[in-house]
Amino acid sequence: MPVKKQEAHRALELLEDYHARLSEPQDRALRIAIERVIRIFKSRLFQALLDIQEFYELTLLDDSKSIQQKTAETLQIATKWEKDGQAVKIADFIKSSNLNRNCAYEFNNDASSNQTNQSALNQNPIANNVSAQAQAEALSRTFKSELEEILNQRMRIESDTENAKEPTVEQQQKQQQAQQRSSRSPQQQNPQQQQGSKSRSGSQTVNGDDSWLYEDIQLERGNSGLGFSIAGGTDNPHIGTDTSIYITKLISGGAAAADGRLSINDIIVSVNDVSVVDVPHASAVDALKKAGNVVKLHVKRKRGTATTPAAGSAAGDARDSAASGPKVIEIDLVKGGKGLGFSIAGGIGNQHIPGDNGIYVTKLMDGGAAQVDGRLSIGDKLIAVRTNGSEKNLENVTHELAVATLKSITDKVTLIIGKTQHLTTSASGGGGGGLSSGQQLSQSQSQLATSQSQSQVHQQQHATPMVNSQSTEPGSRYASTNVLAAVPPGTPRAVSTEDITREPRTITIQKGPQGLGFNIVGGEDGQGIYVSFILAGGPADLGSELKRGDQLLSVNNVNLTHATHEEAAQALKTSGGVVTLLAQYRPEEYNRFEARIQELKQQAALGAGGSGTLLRTTQKRSLYVRALFDYDPNRDDGLPSRGLPFKHGDILHVTNASDDEWWQARRVLGDNEDEQIGIVPSKRRWERKMRARDRSVKFQGHAAANNNLDKQSTLDRKKKNFTFSRKFPFMKSRDEKNEDGSDQEPFMLCYTQDDANAEGASEENVLSYEAVQRLSINYTRPVIILGPLKDRINDDLISEYPDKFGSCVPHTTRPKREYEVDGRDYHFVSSREQMERDIQNHLFIEAGQYNDNLYGTSVASVREVAEKGKHCILDVSGNAIKRLQVAQLYPVAVFIKPKSVDSVMEMNRRMTEEQAKKTYERAIKMEQEFGEYFTGVVQGDTIEEIYSKVKSMIWSQSGPTIWVPSKESL
């Protein structure tokens, strides 16, 4: 099929369409090759566009040039292009020919450079002027048509978004004029621009496309921002005297990491066609802030430079750059009885090395396949795995995905490993004194009162909205932790480098919603205040100017040179929205401070056999707990190291609970434990944080709905309304039965004496952790559904699974009716006194009174159903959970937690807003009172989703091995 000239613009579209259809694994090599062709095509098309536009501006639009000059230049440029077969650098050509706009006089008088053309034009001045003018106008019209076509193609190829307004040719010309001066190498720029611009290191060594790769990257700003940090500028060069704006970090979850093309050490040339070459750091930051939601970056990087792997890149890409970056090797392992024999850490959301989403080897098992092979080392980066003919990329993936990939290996596997000395050093803390994530957390400073150090050293977090452990001030945004947790495990020591000036630097940080995003230590004995940790993605990290190891000399002109820790914390706390820091990079002093912390830790460990107090605080305590709250480490800026996320009901193996503030833990998944270890807040820390948060906002039961009861406690109203509760002080009122959400006739429900007492004190209860132990059972667990929709869920379970779910027969003192059968409809108790004695003896999990008759559910009835292999569905209150546990019948207690009042109304459209509000408040109150007894909490947007989650929880908690409360103290 012949190629038509008018269809040339579709070449790129056809190529990209073909590339998109290559989805099979065997097409990978072809895809990579086509990607190279597309990049080259785009680069050359863009270069041609710049050359034509430059010619148009410097020659045709130059009013200082005569028609003869423009004609001569045009002919020479055309001849040059035809001869060379490629575009010519217009500015360099005009300069070499003395044809630029500042050389008009020399052009007209230089016979040696254009003697032939000049003599031909001067033979008939009038005729030739008319002819030349007509020729130039014709050329201009032709050029304009061609330029518009190229510009329209360019806009189609690199349009920002589908909804973006299509720029006009005139707007595009103006944008390209600014971009071409910033995006092309200095040799391609206008000579006057080169002479007028400030020279910078690195610019002189550029050799066009031989030294640099240029790339246009379009990012869409999401909830996590653009997701990268920058450094550099004319006021703060990043490398030597190079004032370029460098990419220094890619933030996990950000737009840049998701896109996968931007790399660390890339140089930003322009932002949305605004040049950031030779500009102050603040100007580059401002350009990024003003760029809007769709940001187009024009970046360059040196050829042959190893870059941070992009998201989605395969192992082959890593091997392609291995010659100049990390050494990439392949290791064949055969899975044995001990598995592959190594542990991993890292991944998106659980970075092992700050700023790096890679998966790293953290432990080699004795006698395992990896140790026997001998080539795999701690600190190696796992790039990909190949098994059964398929290759799985493990760069920029979650930790869970990496674990699942390794677990799916059945026998033989090939590991693609990146060996980098830097990674190994970082992973181990940068030195022998560094803490690793697996090491023991140490005691608080208050318990380290030795003769050598009586001072208290805190780690200060300037981002967490919680109350200081030493203060009851509600508005405090600072949380101190102990001295030995001040050094984040696994975080590299501050390493001296000449890239960071040792002179004091002025740094401005805009405080974000969660604070400044860095920690400080020090402040005792005149040792200074040092930055010990910078939160990834926080304001300090995004600015890229503050460094770990910086000493803070002043905050908003408040001198901190000899300040105490408390004075520095107060200065930062009251610094306002914009904070100006005077910092000096002093890594040696900071490392000495860190070494002192390590020395204190070692002394504490060596002295463990001494006093009883020291022994109790330094021994490594391990236990299993059930989490009674949801925890997202990304929202806890006080973390000294990598956090471990979990949900309400998750089982955690706390491997080290010796610290008062932070525990080390890993999740228990079924019969196994996750290899990923992380930091979680201790029981004490979490409860303190929650009480501080709720100090000014107390939930008052249904006092909000009934102002007349504001001053009455729940227990007082019980005693006032029902005299029966004085005889049986575990009775529950009719209005509270309705609060539980039952649609049945109201009647009184029994508590036990200790339940009643506990309820009066439960208002201050904060749910944190429950100590648990593993137990094997030989019965089917009862099921208790609490919260809105419980009646519908109960009915659906029995209807859908009649062979798996059932109900027990209740007891009553009511006389038997003619059609009723004892033991089928009710267990009829002969006397009221007998049933009252059984209630007092805790033989009933719940009982109540209706029309002067007692009704109740006995432990024996529930056990009878459980031993028949059915889940006994119980419509009871939260107090029955504890009574079943005492009777060794551990129920699966599922709480359906509504998301909002609106969600309650959505699931029951017959409800009024007032009814929905009361239902929602009752549910929240129920969670506060009984949350510690819930097996799990379920939320959803639809009834079907909630029902599905409830079933999944019941199946997963059915046994035969379950986790039950233990008596171990937390």
Curated annotation (Swiss-Prot):
Residues 171-204, 437-462 have a biased composition (Low complexity). InterPro entries: DLG1-like (IPR016313), GK/Ca_channel_bsu (IPR008145), Guanylate_kin-like_dom (IPR008144), Guanylate_kinase_CS (IPR020590), L27_1 (IPR015143), L27_dom (IPR004172), L27_dom_sf (IPR036892), P-loop_NTPase (IPR027417). It is a peripheral membrane protein. Keywords: Cell adhesion, Cell junction, Cell membrane, Cytoplasm, Cytoskeleton, Developmental protein, Differentiation, Membrane, Neurogenesis, Phosphoprotein, Repeat, SH3 domain, Transducer. Residues 780-955 form the Guanylate kinase-like domain. During the cellular blastoderm stage, isoform B, isoform F, isoform H, isoform I and isoform L expression is localized to the cell borders. From stage 11 onwards, expression is found predominantly in the developing nervous system: axon bundles in the ventral cord and the brain. Stage 14 and 15 embryos exhibit expression in the developing body wall muscle. Expression in neuropil regions of the CNS and at NMJs persists through to larval development. Other isoforms show expression in embryonic epithelial cells. The modification Phosphoserine is found at S496. It is found in: Cytoplasm; Cell membrane; Basolateral cell membrane; Cytoplasm, Cytoskeleton. CDD domains: GMPK (cd00071), PDZ1_Dlg1-2-4-like (cd06723), PDZ2_Dlg1-2-4-like (cd06724), PDZ3_Dlg1-2-4-like (cd06795), SH3_DLG-like (cd11861). Residues 620-690 form the SH3 domain. Pfam families: Guanylate_kin, L27_1, PDZ, SH3_1. GO terms for molecular function: guanylate kinase activity; protein kinase binding. Belongs to the MAGUK family. During embryonic development, some isoforms are essential for proper neuronal differentiation and organization. Required for cell polarity; maintenance of apicobasal polarity. Plays a critical role at septate junctions in cellular growth control during larval development. The presence of a guanylate kinase domain suggests involvement in cellular adhesion as well as signal transduction to control cellular proliferation. This is Disks large 1 tumor suppressor protein. It comes from Drosophila melanogaster. The gene is dlg1.
